[in-house]
């Protein structure tokens, strides 16, 4: 009974990481070797990255893939920061 499973949306922190580093969409697109519109689609969750693109983003930001992409929504950064401080 092999059917095709609908593709799940991946949640990401791409926009947060881009803004933290003061990068435009075009600058990030150039670094990842994609069109700037692709960056917008990724940030809005309208497009899931290929494995290669996800790995390139992780390498560019020097973060593990799971820090950028997740199947579950990320909690707000403020929640994570305050939970981490004693």
Task: Label each PLM-derived region with a short phrase.
Residues 25, 36, 46-47, 65:
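The DNA-contacting recognition helix of HTH DNA-binding domains
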Residues 2, 59, 69-86:
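Short, charged recognition helix plus adjacent turn
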Residues 19, 33, 44, 73:
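Residue-level detection of the helix-turn-helix DNA-binding "recognition helix"
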Residues 19, 30, 59:
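Alpha-helical residues within the helix-turn-helix
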Residues 52-67:
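DNA major-groove recognition helix of helix-turn-helix/homeodomain DNA-binding modules
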Residues 1-20:
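A short, Lys/Arg-rich alpha-helix, primarily the initiator
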Residues 22-41:
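Short alpha-helical DNA-recognition segment
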């Amino acid at each position: 009974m092999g059917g095709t499973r609908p593709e799940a949306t991946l949640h990401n922190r791409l926009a947060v990481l881009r803004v933290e580093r003061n990068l435009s969409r075009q600058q990030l697109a150039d670094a990842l070797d994609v069109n700037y519109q692709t960056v917008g689609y990724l940030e809005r969750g309208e497009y899931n990255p290929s494995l290669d693109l996800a790995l390139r983003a992780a390498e560019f930001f020097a973060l593990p893939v799971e820090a950028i992409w997740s199947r579950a929504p990320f909690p707000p950064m403020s929640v994570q920061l305050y939970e981490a401080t004693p």
